[in-house]
Amino acid sequence: MIGAAAASLALPAFAETPAHDGASRMTQSNYLAVRPDWLASALEPALEPDLPIVDAHHHFYERPGWIYMLDDYLRDARSGHNIQASVYMQAQTRYRDSGPAELKPVGETAYVAGVTEPLQHGPVAVAKGIVGHADLRLGERVRDVLEAHLEAGRGRFRGVRHLSTWDADPTLANPLSAVPRGLLLDPAYRAGVAQLAPLGLSYDAWLFFPQLPELFDLAKANPETRIIVNHCGGVVRIGSYADKRPEVFERWSASMRTLAQLPNVYVKVGGLGMRINGFDFEKGAKPPSSAQLADAWKPWMMTCIDAFGPGRCMFESNFPVDKGSYSFVNGWNAFKRLTAQASADERDALFRGTVTHAYRLG
């Protein structure tokens, strides 16, 4: 067992940009600017370039000031590591522009499934699994939306993510995905979650760490639903949490260990390159090396792996979101450094096996 082409610049927080129709539209607020020249200043060769990897989490973005689509991801995936497949995560990209509001997210599933279909039998099967958005507050009525996703997904639709990231600190809010307080406890939302397992679908949970007890309650109430926690359980170390970092770690780690008691819960190990994580990698004159990343991440990632075990942990790139902090190659190198003492079977689970099982990638 284990012991204890690049995206364009992101716009400033809460910036408004003119839409094509002349309206003002809120743009992304939470993500760091991607600086290709900065990233290129500290590129490393890929460590263990033959190790098979299935990337458990990435997006396509097509927003004002933030473009990262299939060609961009392929460029990163082919930059040295042996990325054999990936799981695509909803990102409000290519929604339908007409029809019932609840069905508009099906456009993203249809687009991603279509544009990646030619890759499914090649060396990099991008979006071998697809996770889309559905408004789970529809309760039992969400089943029609889920069935539409399944039809659009060309056999690759695997689950739903409906963000639940809420905190009393307004500086943590993302204006593109406003979330009400207590969403995980909402009876209508829970009725929607209950529709997933009968269709063989999983639930991806993106929340902030103070909400982990609410997720425990949701997961315990839905033992047949596979719940996959994103980004190490929502580590937040900025805003009102900036001066409480030891307390944050203790509270987070206790909640994650409690959550790990439920066998239907899995965790994605990664996603610690965001502004909210407070590692401040982006402030360096050069990007962090993989050794620096591994050192900074070790307490958090090893806690996840120790609590859940390799059989319920999977590494993720979270690109392009994390690309504001480090390069694709350096990030995966860091994961390899962190697991250098693990057995071959444990590493295979973390880099390929767990995600393949959790999302039924075959």
Task: Give the ranges of each region predicted by the language model.
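Mid-to-C-terminal alpha-helical segments outside catalytic/metal-binding sites
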Residues: G3-L11, P18-P52, Y68-L74, Q84-A85, ...
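Catalytic pocket-lining loop regions of alpha/beta-barrel enzymes
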Residues: G22, V179-M314, S343
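Active-site gating/metal-coordination segments in enzymes
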Residues: G22-W38, P100-Q211, D217-A221, G233-G234, ...
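Histidine-centered catalytic micro-motifs
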Residues: P52-R63, V229-C232
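Conserved, mostly hydrophobic/aromatic
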Residues: H57, S86, I130, L196, ...
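Catalytic metal-binding/acid-base residues of hydrolase active sites
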Residues: H59, Q92, D135-L136, L163, ...
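Alpha-helical scaffold segments that flank or form the walls of functional sites
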Residues: G65-A125
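Structural recognition of the beta-strand scaffold that forms the well-ordered cores
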Residues: V87-Y88, V131, G159-R161, I228, ...
